[in-house]
């Protein structure tokens, strides 16, 4: 028995794990919860829900220029903030991609209209939208947050983006292999 159920009417397939697989899944969740404890050397930003009120300009950029679903601004808890960015040494208005794990804000990526970027100094690098792949049989891994949002716009929920863009160093993935993949 493979644990696969099949509906001959609609073609829907469903996998039902056996007891040992269920125990393994529970163990992975427990390991995941233990791993979520903040190591002493990491900083965490504080999420301010007041910043989820976005400017009309940012909303137009998101929906009209990027052609992304309006609902994702709230679903992904996108915020907007004026931040001093190192590339320009000036304060710039930024779209903020907030990196959550288990409902806790872990990091924030600030992106200005001039394509200047910054992440919270000393914060842990984790994949963007990591909780979306918890207990899913497959996922899509993209290079950037906008790419992930594009997949979500067309209906995929199991999408993450690598931290800090495309690179050959995949060490960030090690912590999530047992708990998320």
Regions found by a protein language model. Give the residues of each.
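Short metal-coordination and nucleic-acid-contact micro-motifs, chiefly zinc-binding Cys/His arrays
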Residues: 3
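The −1 position to Zn-ligating cysteines in a subset of zinc-ribbon hairpins
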Residues: 6
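Short Cys/His-rich metal-coordination motifs, predominantly Zn2+-binding knuckles/fingers
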Residues: 10
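Cys/His-rich microdomains that often coordinate metals
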Residues: 14
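TOPRIM metal-binding catalytic domain and adjacent DNA-binding surface shared by DnaG-type primases
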Residues: 18-102, 124-135
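Phosphate-handling DNA/RNA-contact segment within nucleic-acid enzymes
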Residues: 85-181
């Amino acid at each position: 028995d493979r644990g696969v159920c099949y509906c001959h009417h609609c073609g829907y397939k469903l996998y039902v794990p056996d007891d040992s697989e269920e125990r393994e899944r529970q163990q992975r969740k427990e390991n995941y919860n233990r791993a979520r404890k903040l190591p002493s050397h990491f900083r965490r930003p504080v999420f301010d829900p007041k910043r989820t009120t976005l400017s009309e300009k940012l909303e137009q950029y998101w929906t009209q220029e990027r052609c992304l679903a309006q609902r994702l601004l709230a679903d992904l808890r996108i915020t907007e903030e004026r931040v001093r960015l190192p590339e320009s040494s000036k304060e710039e208005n930024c779209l903020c991609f907030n990196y959550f794990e288990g409902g806790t804000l872990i990091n924030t990526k600030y992106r200005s209209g001039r394509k200047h970027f910054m992440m919270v100094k000393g914060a842990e690098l984790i994949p963007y939208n990591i909780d979306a792949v918890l207990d899913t049989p497959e996922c899509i891994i993209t290079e950037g947050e906008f790419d992930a949002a594009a997949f979500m716009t067309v209906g995929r929920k199991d999408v993450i983006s690598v931290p800090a863009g495309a690179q050959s160093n995949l060490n960030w993935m090690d912590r999530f292999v047992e708990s998320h993949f």
